UniProtKB/Swiss-Prot annotation:
Pfam families: PNP_phzG_C, PNPOx_N. One of its GO terms (molecular function) is pyridoxamine phosphate oxidase activity. HAMAP family: PdxH. This is Pyridoxine/pyridoxamine 5'-phosphate oxidase. Belongs to the pyridoxamine 5'-phosphate oxidase family.
Amino acid sequence: MPLPPSAAPDPIARFRDALARAAAASPHDATAAALATADARGAPSVRMVLVKSADARGFAFFTNRESRKARDLAANPRAALCFHWPALEEQVRVEGAVTPLPDAEADAYFRSRPRESRVGAWASRQSAPLGDRAELEAAVREVEARFPGDEIPRPPFWGGYLVAPERIEFWRSGPGRLHHRTVYVRRGDGWEVGALQP
């Protein structure tokens, strides 16, 4: 299959264009992606995250660093992301190594979040067992009492991660399930691009 005309040399620019089209077509959580990780034994797990930026460095997301995904990444610092936009009949898959983002970037993003989300970040011990909902609600009240104003610092157990892409695949639905697939593979400072069978 020949390369489609949209096979631009820069996959990040192509992704950002697709994301803009997805946000225009269906603005609710266009940045949502399935994040797949695996623990030290290779046991996989997957969950949805919101990707907050995509640039030449990679794809950034933020989370509790005591969560299952964070434990997986500490043991096995590789991950895959999958964005699926039904309104466009397109998806993008990203694979690569994962590193923690600098604290300054995590601080800046944390400050931009709504107050209730910052409170929730302190109150939730993500992925830990929960006895009942009242336990979590009590933790929220404790955090609100501790930080009565709008200044809520970033918890030391909360931060960001960067997926540095080594492989990015763009998929677009085709008639008769003859879909269009273009893959970019990192080669040094550039990208090797090619088409895949559907």
